[in-house]
Design a protein with these regions (language model features):
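Short glycine-aspartate micro-motif
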Residues: 2-6, 56-60, 91, 109-113
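Conserved phosphate-binding catalytic cores of ATP/NTP-utilizing and phosphoryl-transfer enzymes
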Residues: 87-111
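Short glycine-rich, Thr/Ser-proximal phosphate-binding strand/loop in the N-terminal lobe
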Residues: 2-43, 54-55, 128-130, 134-135
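A glycine- and small-aliphatic-rich helix-loop capping segment at beta-alpha/alpha-beta transitions
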Residues: 19-21, 76-84, 109, 125-130
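Short glycine-rich anion-binding loops that position phosphate/pyrophosphate groups of nucleotides
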Residues: 10, 64-67, 116-119
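Short beta-strand-loop/turn "lid" adjacent to the catalytic site in phosphate-handling enzymes
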Residues: 49-84, 91, 103-104
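Glycine-rich phosphate-binding loop plus the immediately following alpha-helix
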Residues: 128-156
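Short beta-strand scaffold segments in enzyme catalytic cores
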Residues: 12-17, 101, 112, 118-123
Length: 156
């Protein structure tokens, strides 16, 4: 079995794929490696994750606050996730990489995320080669859920 985890600041979807290719999703609170301590990440996994832990061979974790821009946070997250699942293979990188791989596959293209925060990139089919760093969902990623909600509440 392997897991593909898609994590933003609001929620994490853990997609467990078994040997027959059947995928089952489980949800926890969001895990943002930059904004959370290793203890708080452990708490989310221990208290909220209800999927299988045994027999997991690989975890592919795509998350906010992960990737080359945040090496220390990514290493911390990888250590906690690996300890929790005890898997032999672990990849922890940006949620933007997940978006680019899902949208573009192995082709070049532009990929975006519009969630609690917003982000975009140019992907060359292998890696992200251009990215304007977002300000973060608190400061105002225009088009994000946080900004749209602020605008709605301001009009009420």
């Amino acid at each position: 079995m392997y897991i593909i985890a898609d994590s933003g600041s609001t929620k994490t979807q853990w997609c467990v794929v078994d040997a027959q290719g059947v995928a089952t999703s489980y949800f926890t609170s969001g895990i943002n490696a930059v904004m959370m301590t290793s203890e708080s990440i452990k708490a989310v996994l221990t208290d909220e994750y209800t999927g299988p832990k045994e027999g997991i061979e690989a975890v592919y974790f795509y998350g906010a606050g992960c990737g080359p821009a945040f090496p220390a946070a990514t290493a911390t997250l990888a250590e906690v996730v690996n300890e929790f699942f005890g898997c032999s293979k672990l990849e922890a990188t940006s949620d933007l990489v997940a978006s680019a791989r899902a949208v573009c596959g192995h082709e070049a293209g532009i990929a975006c995320i519009l969630g609690t925060g917003a982000n975009s990139c140019y992907y060359d089919g292998t890696e992200i080669v251009k990215n304007v760093r977002p300000l973060g969902f608190i400061l105002g990623d225009e088009g994000s859920g946080a900004v749209m909600c602020k605008k709605l509440l301001a009009d009420v």
